């Protein structure tokens, strides 16, 4: 069926199948506007109407258009049409303005449609002018409304060659319908319809004309049998049929509509019309909605204002709400509803279609039908249904007939799959699958099996969005497709890695059930990384994600080689270590090593600084025992070369250790690696003097734990590294929860077994990162900083406080790598961390919900990796982290704070909840030199030794409020007591002062000074939960604050408002102090460590035994709270260490023990001298970067560029580490030029020892003087310009002998003073000439009996008293050279 709203187009009803349409939810509706898809071609041509934007976002329209009838002349047009159809038959008659009839017939027996054109005047031999057409009953005849108001009945055989048509309709007949009361010009028919009456059965025709007359014509009697009069000219009549009634839906030219009964309840039309009064007929409402007839007695209503279509099952249901509503594009004026789709026509004559397959929703996804024409449609005719095809339509327009059918390039199953993909998640179920399959008349099982492959095949060449992946996964669940099978379907299309998010979600819901998918996750991450095609940022992102996954599933151990090939080095290291542990084999380790050896250049060049550290660490930690000699030598060479690009000493130390470990198997390569690593360490050692070492922090206390750096450089920890504490319990809730667990799980859930007390005693934490320098504790985690500046983390990590890129617990100390300057100081809050770098920058990470990370704006997200704090004007010199706030000290002596201010942490009395950026503490002109915080309150020490604190423990504030409320209640009770004294004589009642705060008082939360009488300057300060401590320059320890847990060390529970000295042990000189929740840890100058306070988790490092009279079961006391009955354990005194107690077997390292570390320089020099020349040459090559076309960062050049010498301002390390040992290596290796360049930079380095430089310089001059193979003009010029000379060297003959070779070099002359030039001239002796036998001239023998023969030049001359010792010939030659070279400079 079709319906439209129009006042200027003729139309007839078209027969079609019944409407059972519902709709699917529209995902996109971008074409519901006035924008046209493209430029129009000339009128009448077929063109493409599909926008690029629509094709990209919406489902591809499955329909295409083709012309079927377009045989009219230019001045002819279609004015009316009629249709007759059933399941295998379709007949369409088109009436033209010239009286021609175009017939179009399709049957199931015909291979192609039959067409015919007949002129009515010619065929009937009558002078008639047909204006309407209607196909009669059983398609046996056709009825034409004539311009004069009469009807023409012709047999169908007259219009097209068919075999049917009864004898009753064998002749052409004109039925006279002339009405004497109607003007002839108004008698012209506007609509003609045919139906078969029920009472009695009779073939009838209905004719409407311009005068508003409705004529019922008995076609057997050939006459009008009834006449009705409408109040206006009629435009359209639709016939509404059901088993017991026939009604007319009449539409006037104004759009007003009425329903006129013809037959009802078994009564014929004569009886019904007799009782029908036209004035009683009611106009259908609303006026904005146009109603049309549909098949099966249905009615369809189009509301162009709201752009909706309402479908009613029968015309009797118009008064009820049983309807289905569909959204249509704006400006729609014609719609055709089929079983599975809707077609719409807009005012611009654009044809759109939307599939619904029986699903109802308020929106559909409409797309343009390709290659539709721009002729104005008159109506839409449904095609007969065909197997495996969507139902098509014919569009009747002013020029003829256009076929719209499913494209042959598309498969119905794929079309249905795409539609099913666009259903809402709530509609995705097995019933929906069956509904779509039945609507398409395909097998449900076949459709279900092809659903996912069809969707993936059309998307295999692009990246699926998260929404698409989620929808496909929902479909898989609807058809009961397992994740394994779904993954196979994805892999068949080579897009398996795109399912990764859904696979991860599936595993997370039930890891045990989906264990078989976990290894596939590794494979998918590898494929993702390989598909990144060198995008290292993406690969690192995938590496981090997979690392998070592996942290949760520690049993996975396969795939390390694939991860290495994909460039995911963090996961490679994790999987290799696990594989060795699981399989007890190192084959995987060897395979990874061989891959790195083979692809070393590509791997290193593609890696950034962080990746390089990871790769080097991986190579050093892999097992080399199965490497061949050649491969072992290559690995050593790789590590030797890679160290040029690494500046962290811990990695050089790592290479040195691996060289020592494998020296027996690979002696020569490991010797080279050892020397290279040692030289790098020496260079860093030269730079990292005591002034540049990280801040020394050997002692740390956490929530219920402690940690220290021992005197033998081990890490010792004790206590419980969790946030556990004694909590109040509610018996009713606990019992209820246990019952709930028993019901749901079948057995009560038992709490995890408590750790044994012995497990809380001091224990070693393995630390492979070199020599630890500083340690800090949070509630659940530890940070460790080595002397070389390498940061490591261990422990709880649920907020990212370990800074390793994920939020899972770190089972072993894990290096925190990143691109930041050298770290100098570290600090841990309860769940966040921070460190300060050498450039004064601040980096924070971990819990950030209160703004305690200080990143400004409204940034309260957790940071999983260290992130720099921007916006700080001054350099940061100290850092302290509390529970939810952070305090820093700048180089100007100012204190900055950020984070939570609920309990005064911001240093003001105002109620400040959160501060996201660092703000100054209101201290005025006072300069601060030390800060401390760990929980809620903070302390700062000014330069004049004053102590200020701010903030309060919330438990303390709540207790204060509790007392105040009790006082208020007592006062109120006293004022209301009847037994109170009688009113005063003046009638007024005495009032009690009730001026008590209703909320937490804040006047004591801000900055306040702590008065003290200390015996020296404060050198250290620390904060706990409710207590504080400091150490003076005299080694005296003072504590103050709450003492309920004996945390003050005074042997009692008294609270101290100002610092009080800790007297035990006697004579102790305190060096370090750190505070935990309710315990204190401190160390003395002899390395002893003491602890006292709360010890329920062994945080004091010892076991405390219960008193003899204590019951085995801890006693509890109950109290009635507002939200129910609660109880708390009655803690006995055995859970405390009441006075400072020594922690056995723990001795802390003190600062004075932090001497020189690393390799010994003299030892390295001796090893170099004893090494083979080839070894030293190999070491030399590994120390410098072989960059072609560069002068390696030196000012030495063969020739000046553009007449000027190019000079770099800073050494870039291309000749190797900047130290004298590097220059010595180059010198021994014979690379004198490089050694001289190194000396050039060493002269400008303030950390270079002058004595070592002069010794090195003398060696250079010695080599230059004694080895002619290095005496090139370039090398000599460089040496005279840059190598220092002592006075003795300058006056010596060796240097004077070399100078003449370069004395005409302007650069050499400009670098020497006149005195230096004269000194070398004075020390000059002519070069010796090798003479085996001197020749004596005969003239010399004749003149004198004595001659002098010069061995240096073999000249002979008479000996004379007072003659100079030099050869006169050579002297003249030398003088001439000097004069020629120096001119008048002397």
Swiss-Prot record:
Residues 9-25 have a biased composition (Low complexity). SUPFAM superfamilies: RCC1/BLIP-II. Disruption phenotype: Worms exhibit lack of intestinal gut granules. Pfam families: RCC1_2, WD40_RLD. Could be a guanine-nucleotide releasing factor for glo-1. May play a role in gut granule biogenesis. Regulates axon termination in PLM and ALM neurons. It comes from Caenorhabditis elegans. Residues 1-25, 37-56, 730-760, 972-994 are annotated as: Disordered. Keywords: Guanine-nucleotide releasing factor, Repeat. The keyword Repeat applies. Signal peptide: none annotated. Residues 45-56 have a biased composition (Basic residues). RCC1 repeats lie at residues 737-787, 788-838, 839-891, 893-943, 1034-1085, 1087-1139. The keyword Repeat applies. InterPro entries: Ran_GTPase-activating, RCC1/BLIP-II, Reg_chr_condens. GO terms for biological process: negative regulation of axon extension; protein ubiquitination; ubiquitin-dependent protein catabolic process. Transmembrane segments: none annotated. This is X-linked retinitis pigmentosa GTPase regulator homolog. One of its GO terms (cellular component) is axon. GO terms for molecular function: guanyl-nucleotide exchange factor activity; ubiquitin protein ligase activity.
């Amino acid at each position: 069926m079709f319906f439209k709203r129009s006042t200027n187009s003729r139309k007839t009803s078209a027969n079609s199948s019944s409407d059972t349409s519902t709709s699917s939810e529209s995902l996109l509706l971008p074409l519901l506007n006035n924008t046209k898809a493209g430029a129009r071609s000339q009128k009448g041509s077929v063109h493409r109407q599909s926008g690029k934007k629509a094709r990209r976002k919406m489902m591809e329209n499955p329909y295409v258009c083709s012309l079927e009838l377009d045989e009219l002349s230019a001045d002819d047009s279609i004015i009316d049409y009629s249709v007759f159809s059933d399941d295998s038959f379709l007949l369409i008659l088109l009436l033209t303005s010239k009286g021609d009839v175009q017939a179009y017939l399709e049957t199931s027996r015909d291979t192609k449609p039959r067409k015919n054109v007949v002129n009515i005047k010619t065929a009937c031999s009558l002078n008639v002018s047909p204006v309407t057409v209607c196909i009669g009953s059983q398609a046996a005849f056709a009825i034409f409304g004539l311009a004069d108001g009469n009807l023409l009945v012709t047999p169908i055989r007259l219009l097209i060659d068919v075999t049917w048509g009864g004898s009753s309709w064998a002749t052409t007949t004109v039925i006279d319908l002339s009405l004497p009361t109607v003007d002839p010009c108004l008698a012209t028919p506007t609509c003609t319809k045919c139906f078969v009456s029920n009472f009695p059965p009779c073939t009838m025709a209905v004719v409407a004309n311009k005068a508003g007359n409705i004529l019922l014509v008995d076609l057997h009697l050939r006459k009008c049998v009834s006449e009705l009069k409408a109040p206006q000219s009629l435009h359209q009549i639709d016939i509404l049929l059901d088993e017991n009634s026939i009604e007319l839906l009449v539409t006037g030219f104004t759009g007003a509509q009425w329903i006129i009964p013809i037959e009802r309840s078994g009564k014929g039309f004569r009886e019904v019309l007799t009782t029908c009064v036209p004035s009683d007929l009611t106009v259908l409402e609303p006026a904005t909605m146009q109603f049309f007839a549909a098949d099966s007695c249905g009615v369809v209503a189009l509301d162009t204002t709201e752009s909706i279509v309402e479908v009613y099952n029968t015309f009797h249901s118009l008064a009820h709400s049983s309807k289905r509503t569909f959204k249509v594009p704006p400006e729609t004026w014609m719609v055709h509803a089929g079983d599975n789709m809707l077609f719409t026509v807009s005012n611009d004559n654009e044809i759109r279609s939307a599939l619904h397959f029986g699903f109802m929703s308020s929106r559909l996804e409409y797309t343009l039908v390709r290659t539709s024409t721009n002729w104005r449609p008159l109506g839409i005719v449904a095609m007969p249904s065909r197997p495996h095809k969507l139902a098509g339509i014919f569009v009747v327009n002013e020029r003829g007939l256009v076929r719209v059918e499913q494209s042959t390039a598309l498969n119905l199953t794929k079309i249905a799959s795409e539609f099913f993909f666009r259903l809402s998640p709530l509609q995705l179920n097995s019933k929906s699958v069956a509904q779509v399959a039945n609507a398409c008349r395909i097998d449900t099982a076949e459709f279900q099996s092809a659903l996912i492959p069809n969707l993936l095949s059309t998307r295999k060449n692009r990246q699926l969005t998260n929404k698409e992946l989620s929808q496909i996964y929902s479909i898989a669940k609807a058809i009961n497709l397992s994740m394994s099978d779904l993954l196979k379907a994805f892999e068949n299309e080579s897009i398996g890695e795109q399912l990764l998010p859904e696979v991860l979600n599936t595993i997370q819901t039930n890891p045990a059930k989906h264990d078989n998918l976990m290894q596939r996750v590794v494979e998918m991450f590898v494929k993702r990384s390989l598909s990144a095609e060198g995008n290292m940022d993406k690969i690192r992102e995938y590496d981090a994600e997979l690392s998070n996954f592996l942290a949760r599933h520690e049993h996975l151990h396969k795939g390390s080689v694939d991860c290495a090939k994909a460039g995911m080095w963090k996961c490679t290291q994790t999987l290799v270590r696990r594989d060795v542990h699981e399989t007890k084999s190192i084959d995987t380790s060897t395979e990874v090593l061989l891959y790195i050896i083979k692809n070393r250049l590509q791997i290193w060049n593609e890696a950034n600084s962080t990746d390089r550290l990871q790769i080097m660490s991986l190579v050093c930690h892999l097992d080399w025992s199965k490497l061949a000699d050649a491969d072992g030598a290559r690995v050593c060479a790789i590590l030797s070369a890679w160290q040029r690009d690494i500046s962290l000493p811990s990695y050089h130390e790592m290479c040195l250790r691996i060289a020592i470990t494998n020296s027996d198997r690979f002696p020569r390569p490991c010797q080279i690696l050892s020397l290279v690593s040692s030289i790098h360490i020496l260079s860093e050692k030269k730079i990292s003097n005591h002034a540049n070492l990280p801040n020394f922090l050997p002692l740390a206390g956490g929530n219920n734990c402690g940690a220290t750096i021992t005197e033998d450089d081990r890490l010792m920890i004790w206590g419980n590294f969790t946030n556990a504490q004694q909590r109040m319990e509610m018996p009713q809730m606990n019992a209820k929860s246990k019952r709930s667990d028993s019901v749901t799980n079948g057995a009560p859930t038992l709490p995890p077994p408590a750790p044994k007390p012995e497990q809380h005693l001091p224990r070693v934490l393995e630390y492979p990162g070199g020599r630890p320098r500083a340690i800090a504790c949070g509630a659940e985690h530890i940070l460790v900083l080595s002397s070389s500046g390498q940061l490591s983390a261990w422990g709880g990590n649920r907020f990212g406080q370990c800074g390793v890129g994920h939020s899972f617990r770190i089972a072993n100390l894990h290096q925190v790598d990143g691109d930041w300057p050298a770290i100098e100081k570290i600090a841990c809050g309860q769940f966040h961390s921070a460190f300060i770098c050498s450039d004064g920058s601040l980096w924070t990470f971990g819990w950030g919900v209160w703004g305690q990370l200080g990143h400004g704006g409204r940034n309260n997200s957790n940071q999983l990796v260290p992130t720099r704090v921007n916006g700080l004007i001054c350099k940061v010199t100290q850092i302290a982290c509390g529970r939810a706030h952070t305090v820093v000290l700048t180089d100007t002596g100012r204190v900055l704070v950020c984070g939570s201010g609920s309990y005064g942490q911001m240093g003001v009395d105002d109620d400040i909840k959160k501060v996201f950026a660092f703000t100054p503490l209101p201290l005025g002109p006072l300069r601060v030199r030390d800060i401390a915080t760990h929980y809620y309150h903070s302390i700062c020490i000014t330069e004049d030794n004053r102590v200020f604190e701010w903030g309060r423990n919330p438990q303390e504030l709540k207790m204060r409020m509790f007392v105040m409320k009790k006082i208020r209640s007592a006062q109120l009770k006293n004022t209301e007591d009847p037994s109170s004294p009688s009113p005063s004589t003046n009638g007024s009642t005495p009032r009690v002062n009730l001026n008590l705060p209703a909320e937490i008082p804040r006047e004591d939360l801000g900055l306040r000074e702590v008065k003290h009488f200390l015996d020296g300057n404060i050198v250290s300060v620390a904060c706990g939960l409710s207590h504080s401590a400091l150490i003076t320059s005299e080694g005296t320890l003072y504590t103050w604050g709450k003492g309920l847990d004996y945390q003050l060390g005074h042997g009692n529970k008294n609270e101290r408002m100002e610092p009080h000295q800790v007297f035990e042990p006697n004579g102790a000189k305190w060096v370090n102090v750190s505070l935990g929740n309710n315990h204190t840890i401190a160390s003395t100058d002899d390395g002893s460590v003491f602890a006292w306070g709360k010890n329920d988790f062994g945080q004091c490092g010892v076991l405390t035994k219960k008193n003899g009279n204590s019951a085995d079961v801890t006693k509890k006391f109950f109290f009635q709270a507002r939200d129910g009955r609660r109880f708390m354990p009655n803690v006995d005194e055995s859970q405390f260490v009441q006075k400072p107690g020594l922690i056995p077997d723990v001795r802390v390292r003190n600062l004075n023990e932090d001497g020189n570390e690393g390799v010994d320089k003299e030892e390295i020099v001796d090893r170099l001298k004893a090494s083979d020349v080839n070894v030293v040459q190999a070491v030399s090559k590994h120390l410098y970067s072989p960059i072609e076309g560069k002068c390696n960062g030196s000012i030495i050049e063969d020739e000046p560029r553009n007449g000027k010498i190019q000079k770099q301002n800073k050494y870039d390390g291309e000749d190797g580490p900047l130290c004298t040992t590097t220059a010595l290596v180059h010198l021994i290796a014979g690379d004198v030029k490089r050694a001289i360049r190194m000396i050039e930079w060493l002269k400008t380095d303030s950390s270079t020892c002058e004595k070592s430089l002069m010794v090195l310089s003398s060696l250079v001059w010695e080599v230059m003087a004694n080895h002619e193979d290095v005496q090139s003009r370039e090398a000599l010029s460089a040496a005279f310009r840059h190598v220092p000379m002592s006075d003795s060297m300058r006056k010596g003959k060796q240097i004077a002998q070399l100078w003449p070779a370069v004395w005409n070099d302007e650069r050499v002359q400009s670098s020497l003073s006149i005195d230096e030039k004269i000194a070398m001239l004075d020390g000059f002796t002519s070069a010796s000439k090798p003479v085996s036998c001197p020749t004596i001239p005969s003239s010399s023998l004749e003149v004198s009996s004595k001659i002098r023969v010069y061995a240096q030049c073999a000249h002979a001359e008479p000996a004379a008293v007072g003659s100079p010792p030099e050869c006169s010939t050579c002297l003249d030659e030398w003088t001439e050279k000097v004069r020629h070279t120096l001119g008048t400079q002397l």
